[in-house]
C-alpha cells in the first residue's frame, strides 16, 4: 500500500446525458429530429412543449417545438465520447456550470457517425451532462431524505479536473 488510495465515494461519474434538438416548430421537422435521436440513442425521444407564446418566432404556448432523450450508463459515455470527438476534445470554461455539470452543442448530427439520409436532413443538437458522486441519491429519494454536504457536492473545478484527466482534453479560457 505505497500509493495513497482514493475514496471511492469521492469519484465523479456521469449520472446522465441529455440530448436535445430544438426545432422551433411542430410538424414534419420535429418528427425527423425525433428519428435522428432514436437512431443515435436507441431510445424513444420525448417531445417538449413551448412554455409561452413568442409571436416574433411564430411559437404558441404548449406547441411541441423540441425533442430530447435522456441516456444513462455506458451508452451515455459512448455517445459523449463521440460528441467530444466532434468538438476535438476542447470545451470552453463557460461550458461548465457552478454545480459541476457541463454542456455543449454540435452543428451537424452526421459528424457523430450517423449515415446521412436525404429524407431526414441535417440537425444540430445540444449535449447536457449531469455529473454526480455516489451518495447523491439521499437528496432525491422519498424516504429518509437528507442534504448533501458542501464538501461532497460537485463543483466546477472538480468537473474540469475530471474532464481533463478522463478525456485528456483542453478547457479554453475564452
Curated annotation (Swiss-Prot):
Superkingdom, natural source: Eukaryota
GO molecular function terms listed in the Swiss-Prot or TrEMBL record: rRNA binding; structural constituent of ribosome
Keywords: Cytoplasm, Nucleus, Ribonucleoprotein, Ribosomal protein, RNA-binding, rRNA-binding
PROSITE patterns: RIBOSOMAL_L5 (PS00358)
Cellular compartments annotated: Nucleus; Cytoplasm
Major localization listed first in the record, in broad terms: nucleus
Annotated Gene3D superfamilies: 3.30.1440.10
One Pfam family here: Ribosomal_L5
Gene Ontology CC: one annotated term: cytoplasm
BP-aspect Gene Ontology terms: translation
Similarity comment text for this entry: Belongs to the universal ribosomal protein uL5 family.
Quaternary context: Component of the large ribosomal subunit.
Main function: Component of the ribosome, a large ribonucleoprotein complex responsible for the synthesis of proteins in the cell. The small ribosomal subunit (SSU) binds messenger RNAs (mRNAs) and translates the encoded message by selecting cognate aminoacyl-transfer RNA (tRNA) molecules. The large subunit (LSU) contains the ribosomal catalytic site termed the peptidyl transferase center (PTC), which catalyzes the formation of peptide bonds, thereby polymerizing the amino acids delivered by tRNAs into a polypeptide chain.
UniProt-recorded name of the protein: Large ribosomal subunit protein uL5
Organism expressing this protein natively: Candida glabrata (strain ATCC 2001 / BCRC 20586 / JCM 3761 / NBRC 0622 / NRRL Y-65 / CBS 138)
Gene name of this polypeptide: RPL11
